[in-house]
Amino acid sequence: MITTDHPHRERAEQRRKFVPPSRLHLPDVPDRAEDALLDQLLYATADGCQDCRSMLLDRFAQDAGATHKLVDWACWIATEVYGGLPAELVDEAATADTLFRPSLTFCRLAAEYRARGRTSSGMYTAREPAQRREAADTAVTLVAGLQRCWTDFLYR
């Protein structure tokens, strides 16, 4: 198990708080002991700590299960916020009109989530670590942005 040299925690002053990945049970994604590290990635992103973000994203790029949980978690939250996944998160062409640019890998995974209400583990194991890293990065950036800006995040 890896840790950072300093902790990141949920901020008390944050107006909107989403259930962190470690406390959310997604029916088609197994819960794991390392899920608390996923929380650290969210908090490091919210704190703007690039060193921790980079280290944790590198770790999760090697872990298809962690990326699976992050992407499904982000898709679940975005679905709740927007009443469904907006085209800007699933259609590569639609992202051109937004400041937030989800990765191509995230868009493809989100499109699957939109169609089926979940993604499958095989979709993550079939991807290269670099693709999993970019999908995880997009997922956590999306949730941190929604926490900060709510529905305006995609359209600022």
Identify the meaning behind each predicted range.
Residues 1-156:
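C-terminal-biased regions
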